[in-house]
């Protein structure tokens, strides 16, 4: 079965390349485009209307609109301006007056993964405890 299909495929390729045109072998019923397809000129026109083309043109930098912050800028006593709702550090600040936690100085007390990153503390053997 596979050899028969391969011979048919070989025959089709030979006829298509050396014989009659493909339109006579497998006629196309509707050669016109059925949907909205754009040719090369329409693609170029659409690209020229886009924002990237305007950025690449010389002298167009002043014409494009600047992105503004949703928050109005507030002037600090130092003279610098920054919006009042600007994102700050994502670190959670420690509450005032709290005592800092002393971390383990002995690095052998931690488990290490294959990338050299610390991922947990080693469990002390129960026999060593009691």
Curated annotation (Swiss-Prot):
According to the record, the signal peptide region is 1-19
Where in the cell does this protein reside?
A: Secreted
InterPro entries from the UniProt entry: Metastasis-suppressor_KiSS-1 (IPR020207)
For the biological process aspect of GO, one term held by this record is: negative regulation of cell population proliferation
Task: Spell out the residue ranges making up region: Essential for receptor binding and receptor activation.
Answer: 110-119
Provide one Gene Ontology cellular component.
extracellular space
Pfam families associated with the record: Kisspeptin (PF15152)
Sites where Phosphotyrosine occurs are at 110
**Molecular function GO terms recorded:** G protein-coupled receptor binding; kisspeptin receptor binding
Give expression by tissue: Highest levels in the cecum and colon. Moderate levels present in the liver, spleen, kidney, ovary, uterus and small intestine. Low levels in the stomach, pancreas and placenta. Expressed only moderately in the placenta. Persistent expression is detected in hypothalamus throughout postnatal development, with maximum expression levels at puberty in both male and female. Hypothalamic expression is sensitive to neonatal imprinting by estrogen. Expression is higher in the hypothalamus than in the brainstem and spinal cord.
What does the record list as coiled-coil region(s)?
none
Q: Does the keyword Disulfide bond apply?
A: yes
User: Which keywords accompany this UniProt record?
Assistant: Amidation, Cleavage on pair of basic residues, Disulfide bond, Phosphoprotein, Secreted, Signal
The Tyrosine amide modification is found at 119
**Keyword Signal belongs to the record:** yes
Region named Disordered? 52-91
Summarizing the function annotation, the protein's role is:
Metastasis suppressor protein. May regulate events downstream of cell-matrix adhesion, perhaps involving cytoskeletal reorganization. Generates a C-terminally amidated peptide, metastin which functions as the endogenous ligand of the G-protein coupled receptor GPR54. The receptor is also essential for normal gonadotropin-released hormone physiology and for puberty. The hypothalamic KiSS1/GPR54 system is a pivotal factor in central regulation of the gonadotropic axis at puberty and in adulthood.
The family classification in the record reads: Belongs to the KISS1 family.
Q: What is this protein called?
A: Metastasis-suppressor KiSS-1
User: From which source organism is this entry?
Assistant: Rattus norvegicus (Rat)
